Amino acid sequence: SDVTLKDVSIKSDKDAALKVEGDGNVRLELDGKNELKSGANHAGVEKNNSDSKGTLTIKDDTGEKGSLTATGGAQGAGIGGAKNNSGSNIEITGGTITATGGCNNNEAGNGGAAGIGGGFNGSGTDIKITGGSRKPDGTSGCQGAGIGGGYGKGGTNISISGEDTVVNANGGKYGAGIGGGAMGAGENITISDGAHVTANGGAQGAGIGGGSGIGG
């Protein structure tokens, strides 16, 4: 199915601002400036493995300078899994994307989700960012990866390609920039075709690879 967001702002206090479900593929076109912010335990753009088996493609094919700011609630990914859910089969082919995972609600800052990928205790797998993506930014809340796994889980099969692709990935406390959250591994991560990637891990987390306690 095809869905277009055009200058949309959705903020939910209790649920996901946008949720992808079912076995089919979903193509999300970005036109103009769009903002999605979800409630606690939910992802900004929620795509749980348990609910969605197809591929979510986020794109900007119309050339209208589409952008998306997706912010997860506490323990939810910016784009991907809710709390205790994995996020996979996510493809970004265009648009300016800022995805921020949610942190825990306690002062210790434990737990946390990936910017793009898994929620708290959820992995991030089969994530592809290809040419034409202007600037996907993934920033974790607390101990998840910028792109990859949430706290306690890994990030696998992550590919970034294309000379026009610019990616900034910032892991949270103990998470990798790209790969695993705290205590999670990062495996099969590929950067190719001149993609411009900046990946910053948190304390003891790799820029690209595993989170704290795992290594690169």
Label for each model-derived stretch:
Residues 1-216:
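A composition-driven surface/loop motif
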